[in-house]
């Protein structure tokens, strides 16, 4: 493109941008929230107990106790997480709260009653550290930041974290006490960890320093967007084989299955870890909301029933993701500037996000331009520790909550802003 042509094209884009600004749009692609239609799929939860509060063991769900969760929910969670019921705790509505408690318990009290608290292991001048595959989940990183735990980014590829890098870091530094993971349809890049990567994760306990924990946040275990979804190897089973089960903490929930703000959460680990967690949990609560657990079990029943529900979720979500990809393909595919593509993007087989990469140094500018045109995006850098994307390229797109019309409008603006930001660099 000649200089004159480039200037004319830039002016055309500016004119279009100003026309969009005049519309005063108010569109939001920031968070991976279920849409109202998805929440409505589980409206039968309301009133499902019909006055019958008896759990499978005969206990009354309305009363105190049952810190581990009701038996039928523990059995269900075991199937969901690939665990044994004896290895499972069922909690309240927030899996993030479970993860926060796991980390804070270890930090202040130790991973078990005889272990040194993480904060006391560092000694003078040292610091406790966590490995953070990046880009990753911003709320994981917030837990570390709140506790003053140093975060070390780990490179990701299409198979998961760079395990050579993970293993090398662990061998070199016993003060690395954990690693964050979203192993299936990772937030935000949609990666599913390969069998080899999961197998190497299961052996990390043999490499790491004492009291190391893998926080395996399997938030999207059944959240597929394709007909034949990829499978994730079972970390718990592999960890048992390698004798490292104490190092694995697997987390899940129904937050994007039933009601996002009123679901139930799951945690699986060694029986010793679960027992230690319950001991500390008992200081803060006499038991979870077992009525909510019971109504979930009456509604979800078993994994085949859950998968039928997830198909209904997919029917709602899939057209939204297809529309996002349609705009990216038609608006940006094949276009280059200075010999480089205007952007690259993921095609997730599940989960809640599409990850877009701009040319280096442009993500924050694209987000700012979109905001100026009435489209809110997750702030650039949010998916990295300390909110610092070293290349300033990652933008997370979350199309689950808005309707198709809103996504259509928002993606037109997004494509325009990517092209405009690239030409103006």
Where are these regions (language model features)?
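Conserved glycine-rich beta-strand-loop-beta hairpin in the small C-terminal domain of fold type I
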Residues: 311-325, 338-357
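N-terminal "arm"/small-domain region of PLP-dependent enzymes with the aminotransferase-like
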Residues: 2-68, 72-79, 372-375, 388
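Conserved core of the PLP fold type I
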Residues: 54, 59-210, 221-243, 415-425
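Conserved PLP-binding active-site segment of the aspartate aminotransferase-like
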Residues: 355-361, 377-412, 416-417
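Glycine-centered flexible beta-alpha turn that most often forms the glycine-rich phosphate-binding loop
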Residues: 217
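Conserved core segment of the aminotransferase class I/II
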Residues: 91, 239-318
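Short amphipathic alpha-helices in soluble, non-transmembrane regions
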Residues: 366-372, 410-415
């Amino acid at each position: 493109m000649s200089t004159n042509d480039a200037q004319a094209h830039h002016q055309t884009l500016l004119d279009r941008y100003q026309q969009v600004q005049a519309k005063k749009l108010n569109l939001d692609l920031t968070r991976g929230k279920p849409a109202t239609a998805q929440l409505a799929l589980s409206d039968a939860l309301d009133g499902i107990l019909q006055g019958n509060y008896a759990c499978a063991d005969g206990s009354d769900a309305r009363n105190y106790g049952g810190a581990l969760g009701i038996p039928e929910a523990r059995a269900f969670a075991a199937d969901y997480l690939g665990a044994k019921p004896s290895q499972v705790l069922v909690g309240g509505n927030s899996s993030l709260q479970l993860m926060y408690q796991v980390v804070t318990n270890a930090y202040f009290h130790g991973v078990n009653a005889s272990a040194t608290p993480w904060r006391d292991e560092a000694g003078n001048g040292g610091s406790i550290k966590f490995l953070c595959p990046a880009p990753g989940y911003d709320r994981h990183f917030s837990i570390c930041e709140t506790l003053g735990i140093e975060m070390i980014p780990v490179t990701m590829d299409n198979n998961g974290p760079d395990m050579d890098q993970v293993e090398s870091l662990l061998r070199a530094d016993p003060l690395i006490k954990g690693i964050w993971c979203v192993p299936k349809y990772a937030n935000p890049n949609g990666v599913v960890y390969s069998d080899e990567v999961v197998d190497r994760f299961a052996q990390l306990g043999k490499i790491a320093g004492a009291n190391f924990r893998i926080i395996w946040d399997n938030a999207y275990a059944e959240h597929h967007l394709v007909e034949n979804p990829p499978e994730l190897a079972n970390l718990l089973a592999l960890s048992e084989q390698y004798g490292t089960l104490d190092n694995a903490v697997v987390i899940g929930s129904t937050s994007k299955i039933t009601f996002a703000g009123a679901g139930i959460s799951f945690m699986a680990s060694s029986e010793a870890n679960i027992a230690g967690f319950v001991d500390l949990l008992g200081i803060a609560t006499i038991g979870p909301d077992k009525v909510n657990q019971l109504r979930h079990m009456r509604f979800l029943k078993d994994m085949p029933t859950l998968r039928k529900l997830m198909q209904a979720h997919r029917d709602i979500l899939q057209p939204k993701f297809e529309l996002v990809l349609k705009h990216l393909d038609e608006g940006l595919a094949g276009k280059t500037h200075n010999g480089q593509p205007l952007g690259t993007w993921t095609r997730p087989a599940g989960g809640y996000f599409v990850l877009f990469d701009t040319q280096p140094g442009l993500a924050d500018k694209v987000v700012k331009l979109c905001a100026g045109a009435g489209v809110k995006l997750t702030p650039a850098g949010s998916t990295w520790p300390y909110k610092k994307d070293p290349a300033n390229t990652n933008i997370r797109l979350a199309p689950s909550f808005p309707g198709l019309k809103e996504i259509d409008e928002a993606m037109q603006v997004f494509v325009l802003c990517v092209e405009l930001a690239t030409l103006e660099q």
